[in-house]
Amino acid sequence: MELFSANYEENTRALDDLLGVGRCFDMISRDLYVGGRRARMWVVDGYGDDAVIERMLSFWLPLRDVSDAQTMQQFIDRYITFNEVNAEQNVKNTVTSVFLGKMALLVEGYDECALIDAKQYPARGVEEPSSGKVLRGAHDGFIETLVANAALLRRRIRDPQLTLEGHKVSDCSRADVVLCYLENKVDRKLLDEVRQKLAKIDVRSVSMSQESIAEAMMGKKQWWTPFPKVRYTERPDAATACVMEGDIIVLVDNSPAAMILPTHFFDFVQEANDFYFPPLIGTYLRILRIVVFLLTMFITPVWFLLVKDPSRTQAGLEFLAIDSHYSVPLLVQLLLAEFIVDLLKLASLNTPDVFSNSFSMLGALVLGDFAVQAHWLVPEVLAYMAFVAIANFAQPSYELGYAFKLLRLMLLLFVGALDWIGLVLGCIVIVALLATTKPIVGKGYLYPLCPLDKKALLALLVRKPISRDNT
């Protein structure tokens, strides 16, 4: 059955079967009389706003006659005192709408169903996200409810040019996806490309929300590149700034993270804190972040290259030499330290909040002290790895941190096998990866460096004062 008919019993049987009435404990179905006609309503328990449903029932039940409404649309116009309601004849669309939280109402004599958007999703309060915190500025953040996230953007951009364009993705989950952009600033070609990629997503479910959608949009062509092709933010102010610059924000229901498109490598240099400090300090923070990027990737491979040959640490670089005796090969020590850092991160993530901070500190101290006393690691290795672990948190992207980690491991292996030639070869591989990585949409991944856009590159490196042309 694809469309509702004028047969009331047939319509109700079809919806009861498709919605799982009697099988699913949370599917509420109630028979009632509206104006002397049989009617039935369906709603998912936990989705419906009880106050709204009760108010509508109190209006319908006293009705004596509704024969003046010849169609369901006329019935809606005259007897449903609610803003968000529409008539639907397609059975599949009705079932999907009920699972999304709407209430369905069938009335005898009509070949359409009324869908009333009286949903109220369970949601946590709006609070500052755990990542991307700022010293000053707004302390609110996106949550798992799409409507609330859209409202946070509307609150900041009170412009009729702001468009929130809705889409549905996947066959099973039918996830709600919203594209947020400014009509007068967005690149129309870029917008059409994003729409096409969303329309081509052919997956059964997007249970992991924005990550599932990002992977489906990227496809399988570039699985081998470690660099992130999407930026995420849980901060409404950061998302607002991107929209004002002409970017597209992708909001996904059930996810507090907003996707920023297009994403290029140098976009990760920016962070919300840059704009809550004066321009000079903001510029310093960006330059510091770039230096940290380079140190995070190269400090341990370069140090390993220098200490491999004692003669390289004699010309004023004696402080880099290892004084203590060690029996475990230095390359093995560095790799072991890398894995221990990741082990502590994973253990910290899976530890209850009450114990996580103390566990991380005690775990690092105990393991570090034990490794030195057992001659597994030399103190210098621990010192450099501690710097790398801390520096990873100086950049805003968790995904980029792991990309740097994989490349750092590659450099260590290349240096261990080929000495300085390995370092040069590793740098060539990194440049080749950056040059061949393609973003989901937009220009090259290294934009604005390649293709060169001096104005855009300067705007990324230097935090300019706020003006009418630079907001």
Positions of the model-derived regions?
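Short polybasic/polar patches that bind polyanions
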Residues: 158, 199, 345, 372, ...
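Hydrophobic alpha-helical transmembrane segments of membrane transport and translocation systems
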Residues: 379-381, 385-471
